[in-house]
Amino acid sequence: FTFVVVIILILVFYIKIHNNKEADVKINYDNIKHADIENIAQNYWNSDGIYNIAAAEDGYYYVTNEDFLVYFDINTGDTVPVCAKPDCMHDNDECNACLNTCVIYNIYYYNEYIYYMPIINGMANLCRMDKSGSTTKILGELFPSDGSSSIHLAFLGDYAYAYDSGSHLGLDTEFTEKIVEVSLKNGERNEIYDVTGVSLAIKNVKGFGDGLYFNVQHSERSDENISISSYGLYMYSQSEKNVSQISTENINDYYLSDNYLYYFINGQGLYKSDIENQKTELIYKSNKAVDMCNISYDGRYLYISNGKYCDYLRKVLGNKEKKYIVIDTDGKVINEISCADSLEMLFGDDRYLFCMGMGEDQLMYMDKREIEKAEEWKNIFSEPVHLLGR
């Protein structure tokens, strides 16, 4: 009986998503003109997942399953704990690289500093670390936290922005969701946006130009129905200090680049809006296995991931249908890369594409120089990265 109910719920969820007929999509272009900046904020990572990896100039930072921060270089094969403490053996929680009292699986690299969130007296704080791991500085308080990975960060200019991406999604209790702005210069804290309701989450916060962009998502569940939808796309202007709505469409994720706004509407597909000429076209249609997609862009190709969709429809699709779809900016499919063994779809920068496998510290990659024909994932680490108690 339980199995039948689950299948019915899944089918209703699928039908509700795909009942969205292709619409005359409306975008508020006035507030998104001239939105491009250099992508120092690393918006190419999956903003709707864990952040256990961050790109640096030559290599990458990674949070291991033991909650140690390490730096690795794919070209040399080197992996080192991020700690410069004299005489430290990097094998206990006194090591600077140990993040076991922090918001888990969240690490960021921005303007030559590492950022993470230690929990002090039940409160997640924003902390900045230099690249070597020798010095740290607490910049300010963010949100109450039990250590789960739901608190995320985004960066724009001289500010970090913190938000809870899912702690209250699916709950029956009313909560107020907030975006908190923290100055990277003096730690000044401001709440720039809030929304109150039941089963809400702020998602996919990214900085482009003067604007901080984000979604607000809502879910409902009853005995007969599961519904997950977006209230649209919003933008907070740093200069004007206000929030405007860019679109009311059911947008799951988006990306801005080269005067274009790319966005995935649930039940329809990937759209491309020309900001200058204010024209919109559907460049990739959703289908039974590819919907609710997240988006990444590396300056050459767009990448869409159906990982979240497969997770929601696990009983129907499961991991076997998980994939990255590589397309050019006109919608031509360049490659479809299976992620059947993936636990997390991470995307990547202009050098490599990443995902997390099912095994311990099974971080996998593909070289983007060969992305047009890439098929096989390679492991970063030959074995789990065990440092504790060595």
What does each model-identified segment do?
Residues 2-13:
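Hydrophobic membrane-insertion alpha-helices, especially the h-region
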Residues 18-46, 68-93, 122-143, 170-195, ...:
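Surface-exposed loop/turn elements that mediate protein-protein interactions on large endomembrane-trafficking
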Residues 46-56, 91-109, 145-157, 197-209, ...:
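Repeated scaffold domains used in trafficking and secretory/extracellular systems
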Residues 58, 76, 110-111, 132, ...:
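Acidic/polar residues in short coil/turn loops that connect beta-strands
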Residues 62-63, 115-117, 161-164, 213-216, ...:
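Residue position within the beta-strands of beta-propeller blades
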Residues 111, 116-119, 123-126:
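Surface-exposed, polar helix/loop patches in the mature regions of secreted/periplasmic/lumenal proteins
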Residues 162, 204-206, 212-214, 230-232, ...:
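C-terminal regulatory/effector modules of DNA-binding transcriptional regulators
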Residues 290-317, 322:
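Loop/turn-rich, solvent-exposed surfaces of beta-rich toroidal or solenoidal domains
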